[in-house]
Curated annotation (Swiss-Prot):
Its main location: cytoplasm. GO terms for molecular function: translation elongation factor activity. It comes from the Bacteria. This is Elongation factor P. Belongs to the elongation factor P family. HAMAP family: EF_P (MF_00141). It comes from Psychrobacter cryohalolentis (strain ATCC BAA-1226 / DSM 17306 / VKM B-2378 / K5). One of its GO terms (cellular component) is cytoplasm. Pathway: Protein biosynthesis; polypeptide chain elongation. The keyword Protein transport does not apply. Involved in peptide bond synthesis. Alleviates ribosome stalling that occurs when 3 or more consecutive Pro residues or the sequence PPG is present in a protein, possibly by augmenting the peptidyl transferase activity of the ribosome. Modification of Lys-34 is required for alleviation. The modification N6-(3,6-diaminohexanoyl)-5-hydroxylysine is found at residue 34. Keywords: Cytoplasm, Elongation factor, Hydroxylation, Protein biosynthesis.
């Protein structure tokens, strides 16, 4: 297995630390006036999502993590697992609830949404939904004219169960585009 020396550390690099795959978020090289140089590294554990800070002496090395990101289409949920398919090889993969985390509220069955799946040794670690999804509003209060004292927005429940703030003119049954990274309403589609 390949390994990376401290002089090869950079943001986005995926390494193994204490048996867990981690992604380097920040790397700072420190050369004190007295003593050996070292790297102060901020890492995110890809399994738990926790961010930790470590220091490594100059010249130390870490093993490369067998982590890869792949684009796959979302197919369906069978109650326990969420199923995805590679668009070219038609290979299917299933992700559990921990790998799905917040992605659950943005994915609709048979939508063929192209998701980014992070695989570690062939098993899904995390699922990132597309940046924008188009979902139908199943429940929202009617927007009454002149009811803008609170900033001009109202909560709306989408067909996947997610709740977003939408403008007053958006009605029940309409399809809206939502940014999955922030959970914000973008525009009305129909």
């Amino acid at each position: 297995m390949a390994s990376f020396s401290t002089n090869e550390f950079k943001s986005g690099l995926k390494v193994m630390l204490d048996g867990n795959p981690c992604a380097i978020l920040e790397n700072e090289f420190v050369k004190p006036g007295k003593g050996q140089a070292f790297n102060r590294v901020k890492l995110r554990n890809l399994r738990s999502g926790k961010v930790l800070e470590q220091t490594f002496k100059s010249g130390d090395s870490l093993e490369a993590a067998d982590v890869m990101d792949t684009e796959m289409n979302y197919l369906y949920n069978d109650g326990e697992f969420w199923h995805f398919m590679h668009p070219e090889s038609f290979e299917q993969i299933q992700a559990d609830k921990t790998a799905m985390s917040d992605s659950i509220k943005w994915l609709k069955e048979n939508s063929n949404a192209l998701c980014t799946i992070t695989l570690f040794n062939g098993a899904p670690l995390s699922v990132t939904p597309p940046n924008f999804v188009e979902l139908q509003i199943t429940e929202t209060d009617p927007g009454v004219r002149g009811d803008t004292s609170g900033g001009g927005g109202k909560p709306a429940t989408l067909e996947t169960g997610a709740v977003v703030r939408v403008p007053l003119f958006v009605q029940q049954g309409e399809v809206v585009r939502v940014d999955t990274r922030t959970g914000d309403y973008q525009t009305r589609v129909s």
